Amino acid sequence: MAYRDQPLGELALSIPRASALFRKYDMDYCCGGKQTLSRAAARKELDVEVIEAELAKLAEQPIEKDWRSAPLAEIIDHIIVRYHDRHREQLPELILQATKVERVHADKPSVPKGLTKYLTMLHEELSSHMMKEEQILFPMIKQGMGSQAMGPISVMESEHDEAGELLEVIKHTTNNVTPPPEACTTWKAMYNGINELIDDLMDHISLENNVLFPRALAGE
């Protein structure tokens, strides 16, 4: 099956582990989820046929949960428990680790200078963002008022873009989240945690941008 003309966001939701494949190729399937596979591959100078072949293999596996057809209230509850609560645990721990690594290894050229600052910015932005969703937008959608939520949804999507930009800065600061040979245990653990955060946050944004928000605006 040809996947090149399908949007990345749709592929990430319909094919098991497609999101991990896109992460491997540094393709943005959350904020950039509306771009086609062909367009995204061209921008990264990648062979779209190779990626299509990998997607075809992944598509043979059964999908765990198809959120595209789940009730909106169920999607919202899942987002809060699986992503919001998790981000609230992840970021404070990563900030502590980054503070330690930047202090202890300040003299090393490979130290990720500024990482603590960027993680703190992401934590503050996400904390405010998630609170607005939980207190304003999500209740509107659960009450069947999603079609009237164009304003709040537009703001949330803009904030998703800002979070995505911060992730790019964090990846640049950490050499694409790759620890140097001299990295200590804390440094390696922190990078593992950052990779997990990036995976979670991209899946989180993808589910909202590509499923929850469009369906809510359509009046479901």
From Swiss-Prot:
<dbReference type="InterPro" id="IPR012312">
    <property type="entry name" value="Hemerythrin-like"/>
</dbReference>
<dbReference type="Pfam" id="PF04405">
    <property type="entry name" value="ScdA_N"/>
</dbReference>
<dbReference type="GO" id="GO:0046872">
    <property type="term" value="F:metal ion binding"/>
</dbReference>
<comment type="function">
    <text>Di-iron-containing protein involved in the repair of iron-sulfur clusters damaged by oxidative and nitrosative stress conditions.</text>
</comment>
<comment type="subunit">
    <text>Homodimer.</text>
</comment>
<dbReference type="InterPro" id="IPR023742">
    <property type="entry name" value="FeS-repair_YftE"/>
</dbReference>
<dbReference type="GO" id="GO:0030091">
    <property type="term" value="P:protein repair"/>
</dbReference>
<keyword id="KW-0346">Stress response</keyword>
<keyword id="KW-0963">Cytoplasm</keyword>
<dbReference type="GO" id="GO:0005737">
    <property type="term" value="C:cytoplasm"/>
</dbReference>
<comment type="similarity">
    <text>Belongs to the RIC family. YtfE subfamily.</text>
</comment>
<dbReference type="GO" id="GO:0006979">
    <property type="term" value="P:response to oxidative stress"/>
</dbReference>
<dbReference type="Pfam" id="PF01814">
    <property type="entry name" value="Hemerythrin"/>
</dbReference>
<dbReference type="InterPro" id="IPR019903">
    <property type="entry name" value="RIC_family"/>
</dbReference>
<keyword id="KW-0408">Iron</keyword>
<keyword id="KW-0479">Metal-binding</keyword>
<dbReference type="GO" id="GO:0051409">
    <property type="term" value="P:response to nitrosative stress"/>
</dbReference>
<protein>
    <recommendedName>
        <fullName>Iron-sulfur cluster repair protein YtfE</fullName>
    </recommendedName>
</protein>
